[in-house]
Amino acid sequence: MTRFSTLLWCSLFASFASHAKLKVFVLAGQSNMQGAGQVEMKENSRNGGQGTLAYLVKNEKTAKKYAHLVNKKGEWITRQDVWIRYDDRQDGLRPGFGYRNTSIGPELGFGSVVGDALEEPVLLIKTCW
C-alpha cells in the first residue's frame, strides 16, 4: 500500500509540474537516514535546547548559516520548489521529516542545497529502515 501511495503521490505532483522537468532523488538508508536531529526542545529540558535546529537558527554565532530555514517572523519556511515524501508524510520541504515529525534528517540539508542549485522542481523520496 505504501508503494502504491508513493506512486500515486508522484503522479499527482507530476501533474502539478505540468511541462516542467522534475528532478527526483531517492534518499535511502538505515537509521541515520531516518533522522533524529531535534527541531525544537523545551528550554527547561536537557541543556536548554542547545543543539536543536531552533537553537541554531536563533544563536548569533550560527543564525546566518541557518537563516534560509525561517522567515522574518522566525517561522519555519516550507519550500514550494522542493517536495518530500517519507513514510506517510508528504509536503514541501521543511523541518519535520525525520524519524518523527519533530525531528530532521539529511533530507533538510540535501534538499536545501539541491533546491537552490537547480531550476527544476525537486522531489525527494526518502526511504529507510
Regions found by a protein language model. Name each.
Residues 2-9:
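Sec-dependent signal peptide recognition
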Residues 1, 18-19:
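Short, surface-exposed loop and linker segments with low hydrophobicity and enrichment for Pro/Ser/Thr
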Residues 19-129:
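Cell-envelope and extracellular/periplasmic
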